[in-house]
Amino acid sequence: MAKPTGFLEYARETPRRRPVEERVHDWLEVYEEFPRERLNKQAARCMDCGIPFCHSGCPVGNVIPDWNDLVYRDRWREAIERLHATNNFPEFTGRLCPAPCEAACVLGINNDPVTIKQVEYEIIEHAWAAGWVKPQPPKVRTGKSVAVVGSGPAGLACAQQLARAGHSVTVFERADRIGGLLRYGIPDFKMEKHVLDRRLQQMEAEGVVFRPGVNVGHDITGDELRAKFDAICLAGGATKPRDLDVPGRDLRGVYFAMEYLTPQNRRNAGDELPYDPFLDAKGKRVIILGGGDTGADCLGTAHRQGAREVYQYELLPKPPLSRTEAMPWPTYPMIYRVSSAHEEGGERDYCILTKRLSGENGVLKKLHAVRLEWVNEGGRQVMREIPGTEFEQEVDLLLLAMGFLGPEPGGVLDQLGVELDARGNVKSDANKMTSVPGVFTAGDMTRGQSLIVWAIAEGRQAARGIDRYLMGDTVLPNTC
């Protein structure tokens, strides 16, 4: 332990966000650079806690105290080696992960936790700048081939692990570019896409073959995949959005979040798309249904498009400001948080149920809603409408960001005959193999809507299962 008293000497400090009046006029990442000397002090706050519960909070099992100590000692090259041993893509998690590791930090019991996420971000960015992140092609090829369906974080993690183990890996993606949700679902102000592209270049140099623009199940069937490859990993994500079943849903001006975010990401990438006035928030009254990260992504995008006003409505009650007895340490607390998008403007309101939508000439004009109360009935929280609280809100653009229900049914899932669970997710065993021998699955397609860090962990675990299936044993690491 480099600085046993660091947590007593230094307060928690994180990077500042760029001024709101500046950043809402561009699509660049929102955080300012963090001075190296201040980061060393933040790493020094990692205490000699004996049992590092941050491990339990990290799905990929990052050895966090080790690389905190190495950063404090300025041993950056060793730090990135330790970090890459458990996490293929720390540049993604360092930007996009909600950091459940910090929620489990022992220091966080009675103090502010260590800035684990920021240290992770600085390690990987320093490594890229120093030229330490290089392709790691295998020394020996196995002669086995694997098809990975889906190029989100789960599919990419699985592909990289398998390629490094010596297998020939082909990643299929139905979109025109590789990256899945990272490419078209995450706004640039959270992660600029050159961050993704440089990692894909590394993977190509390691032998991974990318095939964008191929819709597996349509352009190539499940049977064709099985005939051409020795194993398959299904990592297509949970892409079926939760819909709003109310009168007026079919009015122009109502869109799923991904229908709204994807075109803007494509324009930021330089694509020339036909202009759709209904999908442009400029000068519009916007309502977002859903209070999660996707809703915040829509909020930040609407700000940058020049929305007149934005409301974000949530069905659930407003979260508490700090942990309650129902959220004991080291669990991840569901508390009230202010994202960069919320800092930029807009109104959040809670306990609101949409009853219907109305419009003129087929175009959305108003949202009609009622306020709710949540009551305990036999140990269950049940919502009740509050009489007399009905209201209507003028709206030009309504965005549905209410989560995802699971993978899209039919298609390659039916063609391969994999078994689904009660929620419609692909069932798998401990090795991530489905009910069909040689067909594996990873990420949101099997666990349901979740975090990027869980997708990476799932992809690594699936790669381990596939390697064992193909070779009889595996040297790939187990994911915690």
Region locations from a protein language model:
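Conserved hydrophobic helix-helix packing surfaces used for dimerization/oligomerization
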Residues: 146-148, 169, 286, 439
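Glycine-rich dinucleotide-binding loop and its adjacent helix/turn
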Residues: 123-140, 198-218, 241-305, 420-435
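A conserved FAD-binding loop/helix module that cradles the flavin
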Residues: 295-300, 305, 445-476
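Local cysteine-cluster metal-coordination motifs and their immediate loop/turn environment
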Residues: 44-66, 89-110
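Beta1-alpha1 glycine-rich phosphate/pyrophosphate-binding loop at the start
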Residues: 5-32, 61-73, 78-83, 87, ...
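Feature captures the FAD/FMN-dependent oxidoreductase FAD-binding
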Residues: 140, 145-149, 197-246, 355-377, ...
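FAD-site-proximal beta/loop scaffold in flavoenzymes
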Residues: 250-283, 363, 375-449
